Each structure stands twice: as C-alpha cells, then as structure tokens.
Amino acid sequence: MIVLLLLISYCFAGNGVNVKNQLLLMPYPTTVNAQFGSNDCVEATSNIKMVLSNNCQNDPNCLSFMTFNFNHTITYPLQRQRNLEDFRVSIFAPIDIEEMKGNVVYSANTVNIELTGNNIEEIYPPLKIGIDESYSLDVTKEGIKISATTVYGARLGLETLIQMLRPYQGKYIIKHIPIMIEDKPRLQWRGLMIDVARNSFSRSAFVKIINAMAAIKANVLHIHLSDAQTFMFESKEYPELSKKGAFFQNKVLTQSFIKQLVQYGAKRGVIVYPEIDTPAHTASWNAGYPGVVADIWDYIVSSSMRYGENVLALNPANEKTFSIIDALMKEMGEVFGNDYVHFGGDEVWTGAWSKAKEYPAILEWMNKKGINTLKELEAYFNKYAQEQIIKNGKTPVCWEEVYQKGSADKKTIIQVWNNVNLLKEAATAGYKVILSAGYYLDMQMPLCSDYVADSCTNPNHMWVWTNRDMYRNDPIKELDYATKQNVLGGEACSWDESVDEQNFFDRVFQRFSAVAERFWSSEDITDPESHEVRANYVRCLGLRRNFLKGTGPLYHSYCQLPEDI
C-alpha cells in the first residue's frame, strides 16, 4: 500500500492537482484571499496604464523608477503575450490548470499604485537590506490596486500582478475575484552567487540574471570576481591583475560597467555586491604581480594534487601583497557603492605556505610580526582584510571558516556554506549570518553527496526533481525566535566550473526558483509539487519576457512562445 501511494504521488507530481485553491503565483504570497470557485473575473488589455499617487508622481526620481518597472514588468510582457495561448500542464481537464474564461465584471484600464510612505525619503529610500518590501494587491470589480510603503514593495506587487494576468483570446483575465493579497518577505537577504572567475559571462547575461532574480523576488546578486583560475575585476591601482589574470579583456568587469550594472540592479530592487577571495584561491594574482602568491607548483605537480591551483595562497613576505589587498578592498567598496564587501577566507591550507619555496622568507616575516604559527598567519590575513573593509565604511562578508577559526569581527556577516550547525552557533554568538549550505546549484543534490541518504529524492529522477531537495532544506525554520533575528537570509551558490551563459539559466534557475520561494514565502509553504507547477508557469512567463532563454521546464507542460524566442 505504501509503495502504491508513493507511485501515485509521483504520477501526479507537477500537475494541476497540486494547485487547486491556489493562485498560479511563485513565490507564493504571505496571505491570499480569493473566491476560488467563482467565475467572476477582471479583464485587461496590453494597453493598461499606471496611475500613481501624487507623492510619487510629483517626484522625478520616484516617477522614473515606477515608470521603468511598470513598462518592464507589465507593458512589455503583455505586448509579447497578446496573441499567445495560456500555459497548461495537461490535456486532461480534471488535472489541468483552470481555464481562464469567465464572467467579466470589470474591464481594467489602469493599475492604481498608492505609495503610503510619509515622505519621499521613506517612499524611495536607498536600496538596502531590511528596507520595507511589503505590498498589498487587490483585484476587485472596482479595479486593480497596489499599495506599498516604498517603491520596492510596489515593484514586487507588479511582479505578482503580471503572474496573475493570464492570456485569453487576445486579452488578459484574472479570475477568482475579489482577490486580496498581503505580502512581505520572510527573509531580508535572498541572494544568488555567481562565479565569473571559472567561466566568464557577457554583459547582457548579467542584465538577464538580474531580471530573472527580480521576477522571483530575489534581491542580492553576489559576484565571485576572482579565484585561482582568473581575475575578472578591473583594478585601477593594480591593473595587471586583470590584464594578465584574465583570458580575454572583453570579459573583464570594468569599473564603468560595474557601476552601470549596480545602477540597473537598484532599478530592479537587486543589490549587487563583490567578492575577491583571500588569502587562498589567489593563484591568478601571480600572473600580473609575480611573487605575491607563494609558489608551491613543484609540490602540486609532484604530489598529483587535484585542482591544486585552488590552494595557492598569498605570500605575506612580498612587499606588494598587503598593498594590493588594501587597494582591492577600497576599490570594491567604492565601485559597487553598497554596504557589503566579501573577502572570502575559505579553504585555506597551511601547506600553501609550509610547502612554498618562499617558506624561509615567510617565517622571517612572521617572526618580525610576532606571528607564531601558520594558523595565526591565516587569522592575520583575515583580520587584515576585515580591518580594511571596516575602515572604508563597509560591512565585511566572509565564508564560515573565518568564524569557525575565531578571526571574524563582530561586524562581519558569516556565510555558512558547509557546516549547517554553524548557522545556529554563529547566530547565537551574535553574528549576522546568511545560509548557503544545501543551496549549492553546481551540485545535483547538495545535501545528498552519496545519493543514498533517506532524505534524498529518488536518484532515478535526480535531474527532474533535484529542486525538491533544495525546497525541503530549511534549517532556519528550526531556530528559536531570538536566534532567527541574526539570520539575515540566504544565498544559493552557482559555482561555475561547468557553467557559462550557454547553460547557466537551465542549470541554475530551475532550482533557484525553489530556493527563492523558500527565502520569500512563509515557512509553512512546503509543498514541492505545488511549487513545481507554479515555478513551471513562471519559467514560461520568463521565457516570454525574454530573460530565461535556455531554461528547461521543471516538468511536462505546454508553453507557447513568441516567434522571436
């Protein structure tokens, strides 16, 4: 009997049975009140307009922000879908999603947006972690209305609205009215890390990534700019880092492009912040400035060390090393312009110094500094990077090892990527924490390395349903209230040794949708099969909006696309 029930559950996975009495929204809002079963609907066309409250309409910057996002999120997608058929999951009516024909009780010509902040500083504040992103969305026979304290909340309301406007006979229909939605994020920090040091990305790919994140209410893009393989950040003070440390100069992220990208991200509600890893994962620095990385290549070759280039570490005895760290931490803070600079700190192997040709000089330098062990040397590097970041008025972010080894400043945000127990430990100790453990997008099932753990999805379907393991991963839920206050949120990590922009969206966004819902929606939204249907629909919408090209379906479905896709 148990086996039969499991087979039935797999047979119906990913179809419309799982979204009965739910709207086709992803991530799912905090509160949804709708008249399920009602045939009443609101009708709209691609000519629908925005009506802003005067407090935003009369401010040029606020008006520009909202106009840009209305055109990007509503006008353009509706124009592209005008003559398309609706998304479907089955030819069988009992398990297909609901057809959109209904009794039209109102034809909406406008979307009314009310900004409720007390002044323009409250309505349109600088984009930061912790700003008010809440909104309400009402669809009734009187019309469509979005209310929010800030423009960022209003923008998110537009993303929900475009998911509700389903094509039907050349127009758009919203059924189950009246609908009242109250929504806010569960977590403040809802991030995606991309690794451009292993495989590079075109500039247009970054824009599409931000648009895709914005569509599913993610708000932090973490760019891993350097590693052993390449150095992809343009430093004005040390230009040879990228001139010699990158394969092609046209893929290096120049400071002018980064500033444009950060500005674009801010328009879409996405913070863009940098990481340059130190003191390990730095072999590429040596291409531009020979000697700043300790030389253990003979040892790597003689010992046949796999991926040995990753363990090379900075040489403290070289006079340029700390000057470069100073410059990079300062430049990253200035160019990206937001609150955060990630200095890495992960996977340091002390053999990178003890096996190095420069080891005698390193020992001499340590003796002058009063550093007695190589563990203390590692701590010295970590503390030095943090001091430079804090001195420049920014907040350091680091990987978990810096905390685990006792060298994290209390102002530093700890990114837990491997040992999930450190999430509770660091948060209880008073550190701000972000969670990445279990959300590694380069792995099929991050929590199931042996593919036999009882908690894993059936490995026969490891590509079809690997998103479920990420969806179920929610250690934050188990923390007490006080500890949760120090968990800012989480980041899914796309380490890109086998990914570039040709397969990035297919590899990443199927499963990042599960993580995005886990970070945004209430912790009691837990049905992975419901998520699959809703995420499959949003994937279809993202293809139609022209920023998810290359992303495959989560499960069987029908998604008609414009001819230019």
UniProtKB/Swiss-Prot annotation:
Glycosylated. Keywords: Glycoprotein, Glycosidase, Hydrolase, Secreted, Signal. One of its GO terms (cellular component) is extracellular region. GO terms for molecular function: beta-N-acetylhexosaminidase activity. Pfam families: Glyco_hydro_20 (PF00728), Glycohydro_20b2 (PF14845). It is found in: Cytoplasmic granule; Secreted. Glycans are attached at residue 71. The active site is at 347 (proton donor). InterPro entries: Beta_hexosaminidase_sua/sub, Glyco_hydro_20_cat, Glycoside_hydrolase_SF, Hex-like_dom2, HEX_eukaryotic_N. GO terms for biological process: carbohydrate metabolic process; glycosaminoglycan metabolic process; N-glycan processing. It is an enzyme of class 3 (hydrolase). It catalyses: Hydrolysis of terminal non-reducing N-acetyl-D-hexosamine residues in N-acetyl-beta-D-hexosaminides. Hydrolyzes the non-reducing end N-acetyl-D-hexosamine and/or sulfated N-acetyl-D-hexosamine of glycoconjugates. May contribute to amoebic pathogenicity and may be involved in the destruction of extracellular matrix components. Heterodimer of one alpha subunit and one beta subunit. PANTHER family: BETA-HEXOSAMINIDASE, BETA-HEXOSAMINIDASE A. This is Beta-hexosaminidase subunit beta. It comes from Entamoeba histolytica (strain ATCC 30459 / HM-1:IMSS / ABRM).
